[in-house]
């Protein structure tokens, strides 16, 4: 459970990622399936002080943890620049749970939401 009801993201267990990502959502035509793509520019997880192997992205809030293993590093001029995590949902309940995390994360980080028209 998250302390103080603050939602957070971790790439290393017990270490919060301070860089706030750009988050893009897409949903399937049936409205049940979809994905959220998190793009972190110059995340601390890729810094020289980071220690260990990234095995996934943990989204943690007061309800618990959502885990995805879909994490990629993108390089620019040979240097790690972006970390991209993708969470895929296959049911409405998975989507609803993700949206509760997303709303909590937005509140914890002073973020807003805009819908693409």
UniProtKB/Swiss-Prot annotation:
GO biological process terms on file: photosynthesis
GO cellular component, one term: photosystem II oxygen evolving complex
Keywords, in A-Z order: Membrane, Photosynthesis, Photosystem II, Thylakoid
Main location: membrane
Record bears the keyword NADP: no
Mode of membrane association: Peripheral membrane protein
Compartments reported by the entry: Cellular thylakoid membrane
Short name of one Pfam family: Psb28
Highest taxon listed in the record's lineage: Bacteria
Keyword Transmembrane: no
Subunit structure: Part of the photosystem II complex.
Family classification: Belongs to the Psb28 family.
Name of protein: Photosystem II reaction center Psb28 protein
Species name: Prochlorococcus marinus subsp. pastoris (strain CCMP1986 / NIES-2087 / MED4)
Gene name, Swiss-Prot/TrEMBL: psb28
């Amino acid at each position: 459970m998250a302390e103080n009801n603050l939602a957070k993201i971790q790439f290393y267990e017990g270490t919060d990622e301070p860089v706030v990502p750009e988050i893009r959502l897409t949903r399937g035509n049936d409205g049940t399936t979809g994905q959220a793509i998190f793009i972190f520019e110059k995340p601390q997880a890729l810094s020289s002080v980071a220690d260990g192997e990234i095995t996934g992205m943990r989204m943690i809030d007061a309800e618990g943890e959502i885990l995805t293993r879909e994490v990629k590093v993108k390089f620019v001029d040979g240097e790690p620049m972006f970390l991209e995590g993708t969470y895929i949902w296959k049911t409405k309940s998975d989507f609803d749970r993700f949206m509760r995390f997303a709303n909590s994360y937005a509140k914890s980080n002073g973020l807003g939401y805009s819908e693409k028209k």
